[in-house]
């Protein structure tokens, strides 16, 4: 009870200051939130423009293809290794 009476007495002594402070605090945080939202938006645009993600995807595709090739032709029927193709074409020419 003492705390409530104390805060009421402070509010009643300076009512203009409390209203001004709450408005100033509200404005301060609104600016902070707006600035943060703008910063997040700019960061998102920067990341989208970055080539790093494209490079990662390209390297992942290359590694996946290399792994499939190393596993052998029996495990990857959709792609014939380049060395096998060249051998078959030479055989056809010789025959």
Swiss-Prot record:
It comes from the Eukaryota. Residues 68-95 are annotated as: Disordered. Residues 76-95 have a biased composition (Basic and acidic residues). InterPro entries: FAM240. Belongs to the FAM240 family. This is Protein FAM240C. It comes from Homo sapiens (Human). The gene is FAM240C.
């Amino acid at each position: 009870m003492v705390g409530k009476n104390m805060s009421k007495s402070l509010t009643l002594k300076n009512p203009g200051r409390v209203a001004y402070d709450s408005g100033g605090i509200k404005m301060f945080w609104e600016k902070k939130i707006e600035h943060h939202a703008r910063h997040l938006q700019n960061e998102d645009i920067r990341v989208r423009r970055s080539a790093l993600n494209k490079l990662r995807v390209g390297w992942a595709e290359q590694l996946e293809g290399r792994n499939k090739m190393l596993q052998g032709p029996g495990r990857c029927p959709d792609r014939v290794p380049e060395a096998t193709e060249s051998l078959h074409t030479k055989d056809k020419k010789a025959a």
